[in-house]
A protein has these predicted regions:
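Structural signature of hydrophobic alpha-helical transmembrane segments
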Residues: 2-6, 54-69, 121-133
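Generic transmembrane alpha-helix signature in multi-pass membrane proteins
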Residues: 8-12, 16, 75-81, 90-93, ...
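C-terminal ends of transmembrane helices
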Residues: 9-23, 71-85, 137-148
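Hydrophobic core segments of alpha-helical transmembrane domains in multi-pass membrane transport
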Residues: 13, 31, 36, 40, ...
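Cytoplasmic-side transmembrane-helix entry/capping segments in multi-pass membrane proteins
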Residues: 23-34, 57-63, 85-97, 152-158
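Ordered, amphipathic secondary-structure segments that act as subunit-interaction surfaces
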Residues: 47-90
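Interfacial loop-to-helix junctions that mark the boundaries of transmembrane helices
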Residues: 48-62, 117, 121-125, 150-155, ...
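Interfacial loop-to-transmembrane junctions
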Residues: 142-160
Length: 178
């Protein structure tokens, strides 16, 4: 299941940054990096530090600190290497720290008792799902700008209707097994 469309994790950047495909891809790439690395590091910390020392009650705080450090790293790299993308992401880049998708993936991995490898693979899958959803939404929104939409649905309403239709489409994948 797609974390954005089925569990509504990370909906703020999904709706806010999905106006242009390039910006959405940049945000998706940043989220892929942060979620993947955060899943690995938080799983290591949980399984080898917090759990053995009976410090499980600190997992949310520790996870947020790990995520914040990773986001700072991404922010520095983007500012130095890709200043145009850094500017276009604006306030949404530092908000990855509080993006519930990033924290949610880490917490769900712990809740499901995933090991380090399973947690990392879960992070990769979840983040690629986020990337796919945000890029698809951006592509649809770019096409919608050329459409004659009733004034009642212009702006946020049509975006929410589109997100709902995407969620229905992604739910169809839930019954597909390989």
């Amino acid at each position: 299941n797609n974390f954005v469309l089925s569990q509504f994790l990370g909906i703020c950047p999904f709706l806010g940054v999905s106006k242009k495909v390039e910006t959405a891809a940049g945000m998706g790439g940043a989220v892929v990096f942060v979620i993947t690395i955060a899943s690995f590091i938080t799983s290591l910390l949980y399984n080898f530090l917090l759990l053995p020392n009976d410090l499980v009650y600190l997992n949310t705080i520790v996870f947020i600190l790990v995520i914040a450090a990773l986001v700072q790293f991404v922010e520095m790299v983007l500012k130095k290497m890709m200043p145009a993308l850094y500017q276009s992401l604006g306030v949404y880049l530092p908000l990855i720290t509080t993006n519930c998708a990033v924290l949610g993936v880490a917490l769900l991995s712990v809740q499901n008792n995933y090991g380090v490898l399973a947690s990392t693979v879960n992070g990769i899958g979840a983040s690629l799902g986020f990337l796919l959803a945000i890029v698809l939404m951006a592509g649809i929104r770019e096409k919608l700008e050329n459409c004659n939409i009733p004034s009642v649905l212009k702006g946020t309403p049509i975006v929410l209707v589109t997100a709902g239709l995407m969620a229905i489409a992604f739910c169809g994948f839930g019954g597909v097994s390989f």
